[in-house]
Amino acid sequence: MISAGDFRNGVTIEFEGNIYQIIEFQHVKPGKGAAFVRTKLKNIISGGVVEKTFRPTEKCPTAHIDRKDMQYLYADDDFYHFMDVETYDQIDLPKDEVGDALKFVKENEMCKVCSHKGNVFAVEPPLFVELTVTETEPGFKGDTATGATKPATVETGATVYVPLFVETDDVIKIDTRTGEYLSRV
């Protein structure tokens, strides 16, 4: 149990039958009346954000999230397949539950599979990946006045906007959280 007065960003709590991560909190002490804690909570399962107010003495149970390193094996029509590298157990996750989390991840790369009480709810890809550009338009001289970008398709099939000097077969570094080009490798 954690009291609202001890809330910090990143803490996961169970509240009203759901699991939430605290993304913002503020201790408020008005001139008149009792103090309170104003929070923004992100629902771990649905991704929705709600605002809730707690009394500082109010207690909530903490939610223990298991993040397990697993190897992304392959995808078929409906599922992504992962393997636990310690026990070699395999799990299948429906594509609609995983969403776009794996659009920059190649087969056989490591990911973190997040679960709560045995129920898998998310896959966290590595923060940065290095991928080969499979298709992009050539950049032309004189196009660089405003730091222009062009679309490029990488080996996983995802599209990234890259600077004009990036060419086909270049290896680039991508931030998987934002989908942005970081550098050429």
Swiss-Prot record:
Its main location: cytoplasm. GO terms for molecular function: translation elongation factor activity. The keyword Flavoprotein does not apply. InterPro entries: Elong-fact-P_C, NA-bd_OB-fold, Rib_uL2_dom2, Transl_elong_fac_P/YeiP, Transl_elong_KOW-like, Transl_elong_P/YeiP_cen, Transl_elong_P/YeiP_CS, Transl_elongation_fac_P. It comes from the Bacteria. GO terms for cellular component: cytoplasm. Pathway: Protein biosynthesis; polypeptide chain elongation. It holds the Pfam family Elong-fact-P_C. Keywords: Cytoplasm, Elongation factor, Protein biosynthesis. It is found in: Cytoplasm. CDD domains: S1_EF-P_repeat_1, S1_EF-P_repeat_2. The keyword Lipid metabolism does not apply. One of its GO terms (biological process) is peptide biosynthetic process. Coiled coil: none annotated. Belongs to the elongation factor P family. Involved in peptide bond synthesis. Stimulates efficient translation and peptide-bond synthesis on native or reconstituted 70S ribosomes in vitro. Probably functions indirectly by altering the affinity of the ribosome for aminoacyl-tRNA, thus increasing their reactivity as acceptors for peptidyl transferase. This is Elongation factor P. It comes from Agathobacter rectalis (strain ATCC 33656 / DSM 3377 / JCM 17463 / KCTC 5835 / VPI 0990). The lineage of its organism: Bacteria, Bacillati, Bacillota, Clostridia, Lachnospirales.
